[in-house]
Amino acid sequence: MIVIDRESPNGNAFNILGVAVQLMREKGYTSEQAEAVLEEMKSGDYDNLCSVFEQTFCDDVELI
């Protein structure tokens, strides 16, 4: 399991989006599925981004 500390440099939005892209590739998401997740992540503020990320990748990543 990947652990990302929201208070660390790795906890910034750009890194979290990058981790999401990497995980979606590994899991075989289609382009359409990946785009939908990214759009939802980017549709609000940082807390929304983290919430969608955690809901989507709860088996693979823990945000602390």
Where are these regions (language model features)?
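Long, contiguous binding/interaction regions
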Residues: 1-64
